């Protein structure tokens, strides 16, 4: 269920500012999005797993705060990130 090192490296390569970038908001949002998608799939199978549901809500809140920060700092980076991640239909 947790992200493997290979998955993290692939995501950071796509969304980070450079290969070893782990701190930029884009990289953090991309990693959170992957974790959110994985947890959502888990909860489809295990509907009564309320402990994981709370963790999902915490991750969604953290991603929302990071996206809000990116939108305040640079709207074009925000729009690009949203489009690349497939958020906001």
UniProtKB/Swiss-Prot annotation:
GO terms for molecular function: rRNA binding; structural constituent of ribosome. Keywords: Ribonucleoprotein, Ribosomal protein, RNA-binding, rRNA-binding. Disulfide bonds: none annotated. SUPFAM superfamilies: S15/NS1 RNA-binding domain (SSF47060). One of its GO terms (cellular component) is cytosolic small ribosomal subunit. It comes from the Bacteria. GO terms for biological process: translation. Pfam families: Ribosomal_S15 (PF00312). Part of the 30S ribosomal subunit. Forms a bridge to the 50S subunit in the 70S ribosome, contacting the 23S rRNA. Belongs to the universal ribosomal protein uS15 family. One of the primary rRNA binding proteins, it binds directly to 16S rRNA where it helps nucleate assembly of the platform of the 30S subunit by binding and bridging several RNA helices of the 16S rRNA. NCBIfam families: S15_bact (TIGR00952). This is Small ribosomal subunit protein uS15. It comes from Mycolicibacterium vanbaalenii (strain DSM 7251 / JCM 13017 / BCRC 16820 / KCTC 9966 / NRRL B-24157 / PYR-1). The lineage of its organism: Bacteria, Bacillati, Actinomycetota, Actinomycetes, Mycobacteriales. The gene is rpsO.
